[in-house]
Amino acid sequence: MGLRYSIYIENPLSSPSSSYKSINDPLFHSQHRSQKNVSFITYGCRHCKTHLSSSFQIISRDYRGRTGTAYLMNKVVNVVEGKVEQRRMLTGDYLVCDILCHWCKRNVGWKYLQSSNDDQQYKEGKFILELKNICKCT
């Protein structure tokens, strides 16, 4: 992998070793998932292909971002957080920050920091990846 990857993601079905290679400790672990008949996809920045997350980290595919369809993700890597701001969304007010690809600095989504609604607090610490800003990496 190129130097642009602090962490890169490898298909766990193709290698007997850990599926997440890192200079540091691995950040991802597919927990309690059967590896039979599971389609593994690595998602990256659409512009520079830096790895961001995997299909094993998707919580929901039923989200809308600024540019259209988005995924709610449990973990992402290789991003830097932008300025913290308050945003009004369909489900309430949130304290969020944009997340930028650490290599090319393009916006790929945002991180939920705090929710004003108790029933939306499960989103805190989770990430939105906008599909128009990401791609499938092979």
UniProtKB/Swiss-Prot annotation:
Alphabetical keyword list: Metal-binding, Zinc
Taxonomic superkingdom: Eukaryota
InterPro entries: Yippee (IPR034751), Yippee/Mis18/Cereblon (IPR004910), Yippee_fam (IPR039058)
This protein's GO CC annotations: ubiquitin ligase complex
A Gene Ontology molecular function term of the record: metal ion binding
Annotated binding of Zn(2+), by residue: 45, 48, 101, 104
Matching Pfam families: Yippee-Mis18
Residues of the Yippee domain: 41-138
Family: Belongs to the yippee family.
Designated name of the protein: Protein yippee-like MOH1
Source organism of this protein record: Saccharomyces cerevisiae (strain ATCC 204508 / S288c) (Baker's yeast)
Gene name, Swiss-Prot/TrEMBL: MOH1
